[in-house]
Amino acid sequence: MRLIYFFVLMLLPLLAFSQEEAFYIQFTDEDIRDAFTKIEDKYNVLFSYKDEDLSKNRITIKREKRTLLEVLAAIKDVTGLNYKVLNNRYVIINQNSEKDVDFNALDKVVIRSYLTKGIKKNSDGSYNIQPVKLGILPGLTEPDVLESIQLLPGVLSPNETATSFFVRGGASDQNRLIWDGITIYHKGHLFGMISPLNPNVTSEIKFINKGAHARYGERLSSVIDVSSRTDISNETTAELGFNGISADALLDIPIIKDKLNIQASYRRSYMDVFETVTFNQLADKVFESTKIKDIENGNNDFLFSDYNVKLNYKPNKKNRLYASVISIENQLDYSVNDSENNTSYTDRLMTTNTGYGLGWSIDWSKKIAQTTTAFFSDYKLNYNFITKENNEQTSDFEKRNTIYDSGISSELRINVSENSNVTFGYQYTLKDVAYAFLNTTNLVFVLDTEDNIVQTHSLFGSYDYSNLELIDVSVGFRASYFEELDAVRLEPRLQVFKSIVKNLKFQATAEIKNQIISEIDETILSDLSLENRVWRLADGSAFPIINSQQVSSGFIYNKQGFSIDVDAYFKKLKNITALSLGFLNPESNNFNIGKQRVFGVDAFVKKRFNGFTSWLSYSFNRSKSNFDNLNDDRDFTSKSNVTHAVSSAVSYKLNGFQLALGWKWQTGKPYTISQQDGDGLVFNEGINTGELPNYHRLDFSSTYSFKFSEQNKLKGKVGFSVRNIYNRKNLISREYTGNNSLNDPIKLIEKYALGITPNLMFRVYW
């Protein structure tokens, strides 16, 4: 809190601003959204609007010295858009008259270009990311859905994967990933290095790390709610592209003008045909400390693919429907032949996630709207380790993990007044989760085969009050009944966003959440040492329902392209579980129940000037865990703890060129210190008492967008990026594992981050 007070005192002298001041300003065939961003910077205002109201408006205004009201009047003359200025600070834009403005439906943005163009922070604390509008980010040639999130304060991926990131000290399985209402369980392509979702078909991402709306349940740390394209175009459009890992295609075809269209996309790796430097670098990291890396004469066949198909139907102005399908698949087939001993070994691993979603939105009147969705998600992990001698199979270790997740949700939204609305709804989900380890009778450690079902009934409601001149408040409540567990959980939610003085806002949230599905480690069971986490359901006893309580508070300062965002938080988790072998307790392989406490501060500073955007973020995190019968019942540092993390970047845009340079630095992850004696490794200093060396890397990206000619609509984009420019050798993991038997010694496994990794991208649109 001292840090917050310090920033407030430093900023108070900067708060004076004359709204009547005039500036020279001009626009030449500029997108209206870009024009609004420039006006925000110059006149220290914030625009609120619905994207559909802006359509494809472009604007040209000659250079003149104008006040804010004069600029808005000129825009109205050119576009016909109406405006209303509130409190000399907020500008409401819409197509209708002022009397018809739906304030509840407007975009309540507090920082419009958070890291870069296309990332917005809203008054409820959530972030909106629109990949099609996303500016360049360091190290990325394309707007990867999940890697973009990792640049936000408080989000860290110490293992450098796209999917296994920590949000405010929470484990990666505490993040809920949703695609068109479908819960996704797949961990990503190339064992998490690449997002499972195609960014080129993604329309919008809503990321929530605190104070989630009452409609969101199931996970403790965050929600990543991803929507594919919802607009219905009257023209056929297509895209083709490739990068150093995969190629993809996208097609959007109108079927009935303004009413019905179909969108389809397909992405596939091409490593089975041609291996690039990019793939080899990623593969070196992924397969490090595995048989694939250790044995040189093995045959490794790996590929991934995903596709999406979506129908959008708008029969009239009041109704909108969609049907969406997504499929994600990874395959690995690795074999080794020992001709001298006439033996062979084969590892086969396949992970798939197929989902189906339906949605219907209807406006019953100007004040009442309803949204109903249904989904089914099918996740499968199949692993086989087959040994043959003299061409006859001698052993087959088999691992299975399946999830059948289905549900339906309906919510009603009522605009009570110009400034307030209420939402209430019902959700039903059925989760059927199973895991099995077959033909493993010779192993000392075997997890029991299990198949559990949990049905959940949830009622939720919220009251939202929004007055841009005074305060934004959201009070919500969620009540869930877990049928098979015969348990009820209550989850209050609160969000507050309040103006203190001009340009300075106070933000606060509080929430309680519960989680019934989580991942468990079984590293000792898989010779391949990949995908060593399996999903399982709570059973109310050995695996209780996990509970989280979080509060946060901070402030936001925003003036003329200069933004500061500081947020402090405290989070408490109960009933988390851990396999004691993971903490090096060979006498018992029981699951232990524990608790975790997290305190942290996230800070962000950004400045835009003359085509440049620069930002700096800092995160402090202190996370402690305590488990019964572990570490002598004493607290120890959580494995997700990264005490200090700093990210900084500068980007520049000029016409079609974009450049970005970014640097990351963070303290190392904790690890358990070991010593060598005559019997192997021993552990006498407690759990996670050591800390890995500091991590840092420098990334670069550049893109160029162009037209092939002025006579046709064919456009192109080319990009180049380099991760870890100075090829820093970062140690990111120091762990220990057995080898399928306690009679074998415990082994030390060290893993390193990516070395210097270039990537290329080329894309065409028409």
Can you say where each PLM-predicted feature lies in the sequence?
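Outer membrane beta-barrel strand-and-loop segments of large Gram-negative receptors
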Residues: D405-S409, D448-F460, G540-P544, Q550, ...
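C-terminal beta-signal and adjacent terminal beta-strands/loops
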Residues: M271-V277, Q666-G678, Y704-W766
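Short, acidic, small-residue-rich periplasmic hinge/interaction motif at the N-terminus
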Residues: F36, E40-Y43, T79, L86-I136, ...
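Transmembrane beta-barrel wall of Gram-negative outer-membrane proteins
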Residues: I245-Y270, F287-Q331, T351-A369, V416-V422
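Structural signature of Gram-negative outer-membrane beta-barrels, strongest in the C-terminal barrel
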Residues: S417-T423, Q427, L447-K572, W615-S619, ...
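Gram-negative outer-membrane beta-barrel transporters
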Residues: F570-K572, F591-Q675
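Periplasmic N-terminal accessory/gating domains of Gram-negative outer-membrane beta-barrel systems
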Residues: K121-D173, G181-N200, E204-A212, R229
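Surface-exposed extracellular loop regions of Gram-negative outer-membrane beta-barrel proteins
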Residues: K380-N382, A434-N439, E483, N503-V551, ...
